[in-house]
Amino acid sequence: MAVEGGMKCVKFLLYVLLLAFCACAVGLIAIGVAVQVVLKQAITHETTAGSLLPVVIIAVGAFLFLVAFVGCCGACKENYCLMITFAIFLSLIMLVEVAVAIAGYVFRDQVKSEFSKSFQKQMQNYLTDNKTATILDKLQKENKCCGASNYTDWERIPGMAKDRVPDSCCINITVGCGNDFKESTIHTQGCVETIAAWLRKNVLLVAGAALGIAFVEVLGIIFSCCLVKSIRSGYEVM
């Protein structure tokens, strides 16, 4: 039958889309973890809407992977209930992704503000807390930055000499290189702006990926509905 052949094609395309969903799920989880790592490095301890975004992204990725598994089982067994469940869950994921995108846009400035406040707060403990010093040094070294807004923030730290910055601010790091420094020998840009730039760059990547994922999800919903209709009508699509 022509319809049977058409449904076989739809079923095959649905399998391809399910593989794409798995890849998208892994991508979302990776992006969420990467953003969460940056938030941890920026020492943002407060639980706010901005800091929860990566957790939501990871959760959506994990749920998408689970939904793809349900869809695969439903398509393989040609189970009406599983395919309906797959289509409904896929629609819910699309709504959550839209909500996350809106939240990311709304709270973008708040995230930067969190970075700044938390970074400056922890700078006060640089000379008295070795753990904090290690984290800040790692952050400054990896991001090639110095201070929150810029290197002059270190001048306001109790116990820190006016002509000194941490060695991790130096372009070429050696022991004591932060003493009697020159602007030409250190990174002058603040870490808050550096991290904010990283986040802005990745927000664009996430936005582009989200559009691609949304398109694939729409196709998934359409194909699953076609398969559901075929199953309900009693066609054999093995």
From Swiss-Prot:
**Which positions does UniProt annotate with glycan attachment?**
N130, N150, N172
Extract the GO molecular function terms from the UniProt entry: protein-containing complex binding
Give the membrane topology, semicolon-separated if more than one.
Answer: Multi-pass membrane protein
Q: What is its main location?
A: membrane
Q: Which PROSITE patterns match?
A: TM4_1
Q: In which tissues is it expressed?
A: Detected in mast cells and platelets (at protein level).
- Chain segments annotated as transmembrane: 12-32, 52-72, 82-102, 204-224
Which domain of life does the protein's organism represent? Eukaryota
Name one matching Pfam family: Tetraspanin
Q: Which stretch carries the motif Lysosomal targeting motif?
A: 234-238
Query: Any idea where this protein resides?
Result: Cell membrane; Lysosome membrane; Late endosome membrane; Endosome, Multivesicular body
Question: Which GO CC annotations does the UniProt entry carry?
Answer: cell surface; endosome lumen; endosome membrane; extracellular exosome; extracellular space; late endosome; late endosome membrane; lysosomal membrane
Q: Which residues lie on this side of the membrane: Extracellular?
A: 33-51, 103-203
Membrane topology (Cytoplasmic): 2-11, 73-81, 225-238
Give the matching PANTHER family.
Answer: CD63 ANTIGEN, TETRASPANIN
Identify its protein family: Belongs to the tetraspanin (TM4SF) family.
The function of this protein is:
Functions as a cell surface receptor for TIMP1 and plays a role in the activation of cellular signaling cascades. Plays a role in the activation of ITGB1 and integrin signaling, leading to the activation of AKT, FAK/PTK2 and MAP kinases. Promotes cell survival, reorganization of the actin cytoskeleton, cell adhesion, spreading and migration, via its role in the activation of AKT and FAK/PTK2. Plays a role in VEGFA signaling via its role in regulating the internalization of KDR/VEGFR2.
- Subunit (UniProt): Interacts with TIMP1 and ITGB1 and recruits TIMP1 to ITGB1. Interacts with CD9. Identified in a complex with CD9 and ITGB3. Interacts with PMEL. Interacts with KDR/VEGFR2; identified in a complex with ITGB1 and KDR/VEGFR2 and is required to recruit KDR to ITGB1 complexes. Interacts with SYT7.
This one is known as CD63 antigen
Q: Lineage from the top down?
A: Eukaryota, Metazoa, Chordata, Craniata, Vertebrata
The encoding gene: Cd63
